[in-house]
């Protein structure tokens, strides 16, 4: 079964600390923008708040918090120009994608009433994009840029953030999901074999191996006739069986399905793959067949 757990998404914003003593109005401006930005993160994920980073030290603190949270994704709001030291210490030790959100507050300047603080606080989110992308490239970090505007709303930005959070959710689920492989490929079918190491390293998926002898036997201890009957009725309601069928004719099948569903829960499986097994059985039951 797929694990219902929330992805952990690190969120922080960056701005050059040297601007703040020169233009004190930037502090409440950036705080307001960052608070509004955090509300765009869907509640389907758990947000790890790294705060507004204006120095290397604050960036290191954010990085410590992100590592401790074992997060799946980092989303970074660019408030204005910032240096590499505002970002890299926060993400250096993380092996997750970094999404730069280059979202400007205003669509266009009001030139007659725009001064330096207005420019830096409302119109210069793009100032650090090139530098941050270059840093992430050199550091070998996976990254993406979302560009848009706050004024008037921007459906594209909201959609992109939501899709990244959905991807993080998939990653988190995979990390706690097991795959079952039952049986073995027919000799010579080399394309069916998987690289378990690669699958685990890239997606966090752990593979459990089972043989068909064990799988057929899981139905042997099932004695709950009420559960079997309910499953048989479900089978009859779900499938159009040619020639007709009754609870009695699908009883063995229903018994096995009950056992199989319990086995999936017990082994904590999200996916099950099966293939050829050459074993033949002689007892008069669903085991009396080769499986492919």
Task: Locate predicted features.
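Metallocofactor- and cofactor-centric catalytic cores in central/energy metabolism, strongly enriched
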Residues: 2-130, 141, 147-163, 168, ...
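A structure-centric signal for secondary-structure junctions around beta-strands
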Residues: 6-8, 176, 286
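Active-site-proximal region of nucleotide-activated glycan assembly enzymes
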Residues: 133-138
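Conserved anion/nucleotide-ligand pocket segment
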Residues: 166-190
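Short, well-ordered beta-to-alpha junction loops that form the rim of enzyme active sites
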Residues: 184, 274-277
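C-terminal appended segment following the main domain
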Residues: 262, 276-279
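Conserved small/polar residues in nucleotide/adenosyl-binding loops
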Residues: 281-288
């Amino acid at each position: 079964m797929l694990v219902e757990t929330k992805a952990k998404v690190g969120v922080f914003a960056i701005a050059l600390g040297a601007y703040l003593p020169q233009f004190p109005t930037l502090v409440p401006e950036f705080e307001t923008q960052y608070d509004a930005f955090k509300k765009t993160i869907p509640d389907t994920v758990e947000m790890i708040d790294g705060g507004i980073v204006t120095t290397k030290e604050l960036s290191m603190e954010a990085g410590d918090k992100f590592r401790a949270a074992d997060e799946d994704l980092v989303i970074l709001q660019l408030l204005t120009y910032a240096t590499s030291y505002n970002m890299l210490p926060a993400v250096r030790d993380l092996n997750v994608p970094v999404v730069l959100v280059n979202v400007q507050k205003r669509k266009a300047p009001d030139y007659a009433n725009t001064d330096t603080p207005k420019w830096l606080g409302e119109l210069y989110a793009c100032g650090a994009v090139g530098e941050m992308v270059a840093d992430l490239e050199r550091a070998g970090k996976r990254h993406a840029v979302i560009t848009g505007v706050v004024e008037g709303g921007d459906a594209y930005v909201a959609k992109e953030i939501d899709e990244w959070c959905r991807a993080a959710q998939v990653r988190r689920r995979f990390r706690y999901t097991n795959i079952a492989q039952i049986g073995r490929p027919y000799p010579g079918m080399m394309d069916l074999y998987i690289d378990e190491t690669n699958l685990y390293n890239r997606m966090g998926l752990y593979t459990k191996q089972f043989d068909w002898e064990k799988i057929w036997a899981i139905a042997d201890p099932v004695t709950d006739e009420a559960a079997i009957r309910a499953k048989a009725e479900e089978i009859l309601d779900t499938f159009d069986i040619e020639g007709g069928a009754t609870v009695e004719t699908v009883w063995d099948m229903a018994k096995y399905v009950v056992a199989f569903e319990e086995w999936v829960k017990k082994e904590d499986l999200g996916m099950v793959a099966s293939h050829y097994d050459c074993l033949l059985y002689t007892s008069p039951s669903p085991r009396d067949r080769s499986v492919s």
